[in-house]
Amino acid sequence: RRSSDLVAINTKCKGYRIFKALFFVPTVFPLTAVGLMWYFIFMPTGSFNSLLEVIGLSDLVMPWLVDPATAMNTIVFVNVWAGVGYYMVIILAGLTTIPDDVYEAAAIDGATSIQKFFKITVPMLKPILAMCILMDIIGSVKVFDLVFAMTGGGPNGLTNLPTTLMYNEAFKYNHYGVGSAIGIDRKSV
């Protein structure tokens, strides 16, 4: 497919605008609200465990945010869910910059859709994908509100990030010097 075809899907497919809006909406919400919403969903008596029971997957019911094996993965999932719409818009904008001539030349040479994707689309989006990855890494380092709203750094400090550790040391345990040192160390990074 040509890049214009990929972008033009929004006018050809039914429900694409709703799909795009549903993907982008989480980006607009404050991370504290997102964290609290998912906290209630992943509670032991929350809607996710209830759904698992209803569809017959009772063996998978667990305290997602309390179990050390699943707490960090659950937070990562929520963080990805909250940010995927932002990167979707950036990548869609990048798709519009790929010239149609390249895809037409590949079609004449007999390239399949998969070959076009991996040999044309991905390489031409590489700078945009690299920027998205860099922005996500920087954003992940400074996450506080999502982790604080969902676990507060628990269980047993397993989901502590430098920001939540700094907050807990300074304001929960009244170790102001340690909290300040963590903040200064974070500033130098």
Descriptions of predicted regions:
Residues 1-188:
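A structural signal for multi-pass alpha-helical bundles of membrane permease subunits
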